[in-house]
């Protein structure tokens, strides 16, 4: 269902500024460093955002009243054009865990700096990343290298899903650690993409 800004009642100052039209783009918020605490802020600027459930796990915990079971969902959101978010959520119901993970991913949204950093290509189109970047999560380390146009996403299935939603079409990836742990693999890939904002260069988006 399409987001209707007129029905939204903002709970934060930033949300009220967005609804009043004082903020014109999501980039304005991300570049300011202000934390996004309402997913509706992202919905207002990126209506084409899609979500992908990467993993659902059962988590058990012993309490005084006995064993409690919850589900943990891992989700990425993106618009396939330079924006990506990663989140996780826990709840006794699978559907509610997914909803919480989507909210978490939206409020953790980042802009990915794209470009053509491959010396084999040099086309200046934003099909890859501008430079080598690395991301860590738990025991997993993911290193992304710029690749020439047409190479595709040379990485595992989880990494591909994250990169595709970010709008990256060509990249070489190297992984270390327990990549079978979906949450760490996805988060490390997300953190590597997040690192593209650390350096500003020309010829990229």
UniProtKB/Swiss-Prot annotation:
| Quaternary data | Part of the 30S ribosomal subunit. Contacts protein S4.
What is this protein's function? With S4 and S12 plays an important role in translational accuracy.
Q: Which organism is it from?
A: Methanospirillum hungatei JF-1 (strain ATCC 27890 / DSM 864 / NBRC 100397 / JF-1)
- GO cellular component terms? small ribosomal subunit
Entry keywords, A to Z = Ribonucleoprotein, Ribosomal protein, RNA-binding, rRNA-binding
**Comment on protein domains:** The N-terminal domain interacts with the head of the 30S subunit; the C-terminal domain interacts with the body and contacts protein S4. The interaction surface between S4 and S5 is involved in control of translational fidelity.
UniProt key word Ribonucleoprotein: yes
Q: Which PROSITE patterns match?
A: RIBOSOMAL_S5, S5_DSRBD
Q: Which GO terms describe its molecular function?
A: rRNA binding; structural constituent of ribosome
**Gene name linked to the record:** rps5
Give the GO terms filed under biological process for this record: translation
Q: Where is the S5 DRBM domain?
A: 49-112
Q: Which protein family is named in the record?
A: Belongs to the universal ribosomal protein uS5 family.
UniProt name for this protein? Small ribosomal subunit protein uS5
